[in-house]
Amino acid sequence: MNEKINIYLNFYKECLSPYSRSEYLKPFNHVVIFCREGNLKKDNKIFLDEGKAAYIHTSLDLNAGNNGAVLWCWELVDLENNGIRLSENDAKQYKEISELISIPKRQGDALIRCDTVSFPPSACAFTHTHAGPGIRVLLEGEIRIDGDQSSNLYKAGDAWFENGIEPVFAQATKETSSSFIRVIILPGEFIGKTSITYVNEEDLGKPKTQIYKGYIDEPLK
């Protein structure tokens, strides 16, 4: 039987001033960083450019570039250390979501995925579930997420959590294209495979208009 452990999946935004130093990772956690603006440097060389993502699981010292950096960060951290900040005092952090999830205890039995999902105007994602939990953040446009218990409209910069179990329906605005970036934790067998399952049989054969772009898809270390 696959033993599981409880761990926090957090999302926060961080604004670094030009050249400021930040120790992103401590021994107890894993971080996916998406560089929304600016860039990050390591040893005076570009480590992460604007619009790129990285999965970090070892202690690492990074500096913002000459224009600073706006970072969107997802972290996995154990229960004991969940309240500890990752970065130096000169950074501005804004934690927006903290959700307790369960993941396989054995190394390699879970994977971490970061990708974007884009929708043309008026497009939708039919009612579906996913094979694991994750946090989404809207990059552009507007999108409405309908679940069993609630319906919420999200705008650029808004973040939300999906547990993967509750079916959701996603409707993009008709005014413009919409897209979000997400980090989800999945069973290891889903590496390179879609995590989505459509709930209603009548939707299986319908055209799917959402477009995916992958950044990270690798075993959780």
Report residues per predicted region.
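Short, conserved beta-strand element in jelly-roll/cupin
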Residues: 26-41, 130-145, 180-187
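Local beta-strand/beta-hairpin segments that build beta-sheet-rich folds
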Residues: 45-47, 89-102, 204-205, 211-216
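A short glycine-rich, His/Asp/Glu-containing loop-to-beta-strand
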Residues: 1-24, 28-30, 92-125
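A contiguous binding-surface segment within folded domains or other stable secondary-structure elements
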Residues: 107-156
